[in-house]
Amino acid sequence: MATGKIIQVIGAVVDVEFPQDAVPKVYDALEVENGAEKLVLEVQQQLGGGIVRCIAMGSSDGLRRGLNVNNLDHPIEVPVGKATLGRIMNVLGEPIDMKGDIGEEERWAIHRAAPSYEELSNSQELLETGIKVIDLMCPFAKGGKVGLFGGAGVGKTVNMMELIRNIAIEHSGYSVFAGVGERTREGNDFYHEMTDSNVIDKVSLVYGQMNEPPGNRLRVALTGLTMAEKFRDEGRDVLLFVDNIYRYTLAGTEVSALLGRMPSAVGYQPTLAEEMGVLQERITSTKTGSITSVQAVYVPADDLTDPSPATTFAHLDATVVLSRQIASLGIYPAVDPLDSTSRQLDPLVVGQEHYDVARGVQSILQRYQELKDIIAILGMDELSEEDKLVVSRARKIQRFLSQPFFVAEVFTGSPGKYVALKDTIRGFKGIMEGEYDHLPEQAFYMVGSIDEVVEKAKKL
């Protein structure tokens, strides 16, 4: 084990000098001896002359020049396997839930090669989520990648929590949750929500929160992914939730300038596409098992053309776009049915009926969108009878796309609903064909299946 000395500290970036014949490799983990505190550094660059530039996986407070640094001769390694279920860990795989050691049988390095082309599998199986708007408009594939796009406060984390709850209870698989640069309060709420739903023993939680140094936020997604890869390689279907992928990019931006790189567009790191690719290419399904991933993506200033969300788009099978305009109408989940897409929405995958209903719903909502200007200027009375019918059905569809969530029961006061895909299709097909034209709009708001609409209408 070679020993070096710190020669420079700038924020989260630390330069260490080693003997010329014992220079650490890129991505090797180094350990700083700083009293009782042990700090791990990760080598990013070799500057020549035995000097390496590293990122600190923790606070660099209290570091000074001349401190001894040991090379561990391997990348950061984290515990994997069943011992991690029900536990909360940090970027280094250390427990932070005060429940003692993890007691793992195996540790894996967080930097791994993506599976080779021969190992990949192509699945067309659908994953039912029980959320009407998602199952109908942007269905998820088992082993696919899904992005939840939205600005601040439109419900990315709540949607994510509902998906985890539904999938854990209805499909009883293992999940890994990587909290990347999100609020500590949300991490706490999330843990208690999982405990209350009795699914905590099927979830591994890895947190690198907002208040932590950029090194933690940059690597915590890889820690969570490594745990998910272990479950996949055991032949399981595992779910990987990342909240929030934008903070992963942002952490890279924070350290990029300190590492001496020139910034690119909007101040992002020049290696943005490569960093995203390294992470996303590992999130994939092989012939032994599958990783289905759901990633929340913060959209800065609601601008989907920002380099960070734009780079993420390229890697996804389905995109769920949350809209501030729909949220302001009080319709939750605030998914935009015209903006959200999925590769699975194909008659060969979902079947002709599902495809026709989804496209029919989109065309009615699109027509309503076009008529809104006329209604705003001239009023409803100036529309033709046919257009009045379209508007009436569109407003019912819009309300029927809302749904009470299990994880939001505390706020809404109404019990959550899980709606099977066949009931979702039946409901929207009925609205489009005019079977429910006689029912009032309010009956369609915040309910589960179409049968509940009929019941609710009787009480109104």
From Swiss-Prot:
PANTHER family: ATP SYNTHASE, ATP SYNTHASE SUBUNIT BETA, MITOCHONDRIAL. Produces ATP from ADP in the presence of a proton gradient across the membrane. The catalytic sites are hosted primarily by the beta subunits. ATP binds at residues 150-157. NCBIfam families: atpD (TIGR01039). The lineage of its organism: Bacteria, Pseudomonadati, Pseudomonadota, Gammaproteobacteria, Enterobacterales. It comes from the Bacteria. Belongs to the ATPase alpha/beta chains family. F-type ATPases have 2 components, CF(1) - the catalytic core - and CF(0) - the membrane proton channel. CF(1) has five subunits: alpha(3), beta(3), gamma(1), delta(1), epsilon(1). CF(0) has three main subunits: a(1), b(2) and c(9-12). The alpha and beta chains form an alternating ring which encloses part of the gamma chain. CF(1) is attached to CF(0) by a central stalk formed by the gamma and epsilon chains, while a peripheral stalk is formed by the delta and b chains. One of its GO terms (cellular component) is plasma membrane. It catalyses: ATP + H2O + 4 H(+)(in) = ADP + phosphate + 5 H(+)(out). It comes from Pectobacterium carotovorum subsp. carotovorum (strain PC1). CDD domains: ATP-synt_F1_beta_C, ATP-synt_F1_beta_N, F1-ATPase_beta_CD. This is ATP synthase subunit beta. It is an enzyme of class 7 (translocase). Keywords: ATP synthesis, ATP-binding, Cell inner membrane, Cell membrane, CF(1), Hydrogen ion transport, Ion transport, Membrane, Nucleotide-binding, Translocase, Transport. The gene is atpD. Its EC number is 7.1.2.2.
